[in-house]
Amino acid sequence: MDLKSLKRTFEISFRKLYPNISFENNSFPNDYKLLFPHLMTEDFNKVSGFLKNGDGSPLNEIYKINSSTSLAVYYYTLLEKENPDKIKGIKFEHKIGIPLIEEKVKKNYPNDLLKEANLDVFFEMNNTLYFVESKFLEPYYSSTNALSEKYLDIRNYGDNAEIWVHYANLLNENIKDYSIYNITQMFKHLLAIYNHREKWNYCPNLVLLNVGWEITDKFIDLIESKRSVSYIVKRNKLLEEQKNKGIELLNKIISDLKWENCGVKFQHYNEENMLGKIRNNQFFEDFSKRYLFSI
């Protein structure tokens, strides 16, 4: 299925889920405080500064239900609602000073300490620091690329370089097994957190958490085209298989590193979880029109 067809398929289904929305106006606010007032647990200027200064998503990414930033924020708000006394501070695309080896970086790690990476959201809860990397619709229309050559060069690593290079090569050799689950991005984030693990000594446990969107049976039942249903169901099943295999690989790396206080997990949230919080907002209609269907 091509991207245009997939976009149309999702649009039709979401319109059925929310039949009272006309999707005809164009009144979306510039200030996301109006749309997400419940997210403003920190001063607005500080939050916008994190986004503007980060290397990742720009400030307006917070509007987009199909952006990784937005999905990670939704995940956080669900936890915040369930654990109001336990969450300790949200960070939006906060610069955490983690070097990554990327093609656009001229100097190789570990010498280039200027390069900073962005995780969508990270927070502390129950003596555990969660680093959240999220994906919304990307697995349904994108593919996974192999690690660049820099990740295969042992000179670019610090502690336990042999282990990291071994798994970097193993990952690339089996990259076809992760055609739609972005294992390479998770590998990079895990490496980055490991390289700066001393920063997190104040917290006894670390979790790299991959958050994804669950396409429910209710949503699939709203899709008219049998061909589209077949495509999405197969893609969903494949994603589940690749995700399980990827999480297993990442935790094997952690085990070999004897990194006892770290782990990798995956958690799904469906459309009701993600959209329910803002459905009654006066700007929800245009929000959905602009961004939900702008894959």
Show where each model-derived region lies.
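Short, solvent-exposed loop/turn segments at secondary-structure junctions
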Residues: 95-100, 108, 128, 136-139, ...
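A short acidic (Asp/Glu
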Residues: 142-144, 193, 217-226
